[in-house]
Amino acid sequence: MAKVALVTGGSRGIGAAISKALKEAGYTVAANYAGNDDAARAFTEETGIKTYKWSVADYDACAAGIKQVEEELGPIAVLVNNAGITRDAMFHKMTPQQWKEVIDTNLTGLFNMTHPVWSGMRDRKYGRIVNISSINGQKGQAGQANYSAAKAGDLGFTKALAQEGARAGITVNAICPGYIGTEMVRAIDEKVLNEGIIPQIPVAAWAEPEEIARCVVFLASEDAGFITGSTHQAPNGGQFFV
């Protein structure tokens, strides 16, 4: 019987690539989303992957959504915490609401999603948790104090939880992408991309979502059973100093 993998933010961008790659690797995949219903339906029609709508910022919604997934597909063996948002602003202009929304989704969302699956993974003596952090959680980024703080928190969460899960057969790892060729990045002004961003990357190109997805598939696999508490940078050579 195929293992069940749940991917948050799993119907768009990096998450969609992860969902597709896990399905191709033989997993039964559930893709969580919180936004556009039409886009989610189109994703399901294209891939055959079931989608489930709830906000990772809401603990009760996460618990209910996870219960539904497990009732329909089986126990969750792989959890990919990918959902994330940005509310960028220089700190002197950042509002409490902008801070709270990012922390609630990008950091507290990891607790909200992982806590309901943790006991089951412990009971079954098996689990794979992959947290999608960011290179900006390691180096920081002006205009993203909220995002950088949340993504740095994801790394601390990963390392602490890995220690708790190690003897229960649960691995917990993080991936820190740099600039990835998603719709969001492609929408950046071309001059900013070509003059400000691309020159910072030694290979002079961003990564594609599928490249991050392949990292996730590896960390979810049996081959990665001895890897836990690790942070995997994927910035195409950028930020070597981190």
Curated annotation (Swiss-Prot):
InterPro entries: Acetoacetyl-CoA_reductase, NAD(P)-bd_dom_sf, Sc_DH/Rdtase_CS, SDR, SDR_fam. It is an enzyme of class 1 (oxidoreductase). Substrate binds at D88, Q141, A142, G143, Q144, G178, Y179. Keywords: Cytoplasm, NAD, NADP, Oxidoreductase, PHB biosynthesis. Its EC number is 1.1.1.36. It catalyses: a (3R)-3-hydroxyacyl-CoA + NADP(+) = a 3-oxoacyl-CoA + NADPH + H(+). GO terms for molecular function: acetoacetyl-CoA reductase activity. The active site is at Y147 (proton acceptor). Pathway: Biopolymer metabolism; poly-(R)-3-hydroxybutanoate biosynthesis. SMART domains: PKS_KR. Belongs to the short-chain dehydrogenases/reductases (SDR) family. This is Acetoacetyl-CoA reductase. It comes from Paracoccus denitrificans.
